[in-house]
Amino acid sequence: MTQIPQIRTSKSADSRDPQTYAIIGAAMEIHRRLGCGFLEAVYQDAAEIEFPLQNIPFQREVALPIRYKDILLPTHYRADFVCFSEIIVEFKALSQLTSIEESQVLNYLKATSFSRGLLINFATASIQYKRFVWGSETNKSV
């Protein structure tokens, strides 16, 4: 019997997931220093400085291949960051997040073997973030 993927979201990180907690902490530091109002690329540039300071390994602008019947498609997604070699991190600078941005992260997770994703919005007075977990019933993590 095929397992149905479970999609769960959480607005808080805790000690059960120290990696996403560290990424959110770095994003909060960036937001504390820069505030809101900049373009997304400015926050990405700041993250390239902040992530190493927080001992967060990362790659920026990572191509995420998509396969169909084990054949690599010419179209691919591009994640803002992949941290700890397993967490997709997408930055936004929008007045408010919508289901479109959430779907973007979920599509990235679906196209890869990654099970965790973060959507972080810097354009509001308080930073906004949403954590996503993608996996089967036998592979849950919170």
Give the role of each language-model region.
Residues 16-21, 36-40, 44, 48:
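Nuclease catalytic cores
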Residues 88, 92-142:
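Nucleic-acid nuclease catalytic cores
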Residues 52-69:
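A short acidic/basic microdomain associated with nuclease active sites
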Residues 20, 24, 102-105:
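Alpha-helical structural signal
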Residues 23-32:
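A short, surface-exposed helix-loop junction/capping segment
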Residues 1-14, 141-142:
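Short, low-complexity, charge-dense intrinsically disordered segments
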Residues 72, 78-89:
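Active-site beta-strand-loop-beta-strand hairpin of nuclease catalytic cores
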